Amino acid sequence: MIATVARTGLPPSPLWGDGRDEDHAAPAAGPAARAAVHPLLQLRKVNSFYGPVQAHFDLDIEVRKGQIVSLLGGNASGKSTTMKIVLGLLKPRSGEVLFDGVSTLGLSTPQIIRKGIGSVPEARRLFPAMTVRENLLMGAYARNDRRAVADDLERMLELFPRVAERIDFQAGTLSGGEQQMVAMARALM
């Protein structure tokens, strides 16, 4: 089962907009306006298999700017497989995956990450001997624009003040909640 929950009650952010319905209202005509209509992430008629076992049958998902999507289901119901497809770690047998209206199926995982798609797994997988700063910068390893990386790091530290307070600490010394914040910030880098 897939549940979509719109963000409400959160301050506006460049990452998720302000969550108001007018963010998704039909825009005026024109190329830029038409581009605002399509979902940010789309899976269309995705079919995937593990050997003879079909993991997805015509899976359709749409995620618009300002939405949080939660994949819910029992063991072996395809949640992790869906994320692997979105991240480019697994190619579906058929169907489309679009990010910002462009297919990601021909892209490598680093190219998909550069487009701004990230994931925070249940297991945070930080590098415990590295500092928080070094862990965050690992989220931008595939990017060459140092100024943009520095700007993103600054934004993450503003978004997660507790992470900013711990920027020079080794990640392994942080509490579980602090480590989760670092993992989320790294995914947004």
Language-model-detected regions and their locations in the chain:
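ABC ATPase C-loop
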Residues: 187-188
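Helix-to-loop junction immediately C-terminal to a conserved catalytic motif
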Residues: 87
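Short beta-strand immediately N-terminal to the Walker A/P-loop
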Residues: 69-70, 119
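The feature captures the beta-strand-to-loop junction immediately N-terminal to the Walker
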Residues: 72-74
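Conserved ABC transporter NBD signature motif
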Residues: 95-103, 115, 148-153
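ABC-type ATPase nucleotide-binding domains, specifically the catalytic core motifs of the NBD
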Residues: 51, 69, 107, 132-151, ...
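Conserved ABC ATPase signature
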Residues: 170-174, 178
